[in-house]
Regions:
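PLP-dependent class I/II
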Residues: 1-120
Length: 120
């Protein structure tokens, strides 16, 4: 309980810094997702993940894998592009995947480059 009080009433400098950093990461992810044909995404406003619609890539065959939905796509991306993300199916949103940006800019750059290449 004491930690909660300190978190709420103590210095808030780090909160502003982290908010700015997550906004920077969010903006970067949105910019990179916009470069990928067949992917659309509304900007997240209160979370540290993006939820892009990737349904235009369903019914495609990518590197020998037929993509039937978000689970197939997530498995393909994990196996072929070494990208870990969450299929939208887990949230009742089959047309989407969830991508966290609670990681380093370097990891985001690498992952988004791999995503773009895998869906090309």
């Amino acid at each position: 309980q004491a930690a909660t009080i300190e978190a709420l009433l103590g210095p808030q400098d780090s909160v502003g810094e982290m908010t700015a950093e997550f906004e920077r990461r969010r903006d970067y992810v949105m910019e990179r997702l916009a470069e990928i044909p067949g992917v659309t995404c509304a900007a997240p406003r209160g979370a540290f993940y993006a939820f892009p619609n990737v349904s235009e890539h369903y019914r495609r065959t990518l590197d020998g894998s037929t993509i039937g939905g978000s689970l197939d796509l997530a498995e393909y991306l994990l196996e072929k592009a070494l990208i870990s993300l969450v299929p939208g199916e887990a949230f009742g949103a089959e047309d989407y995947i969830r991508i966290s940006f609670a990681t380093s800019m370097e990891a985001l750059d690498k992952g988004l480059t791999r995503l773009k290449d895998a869906l090309a």
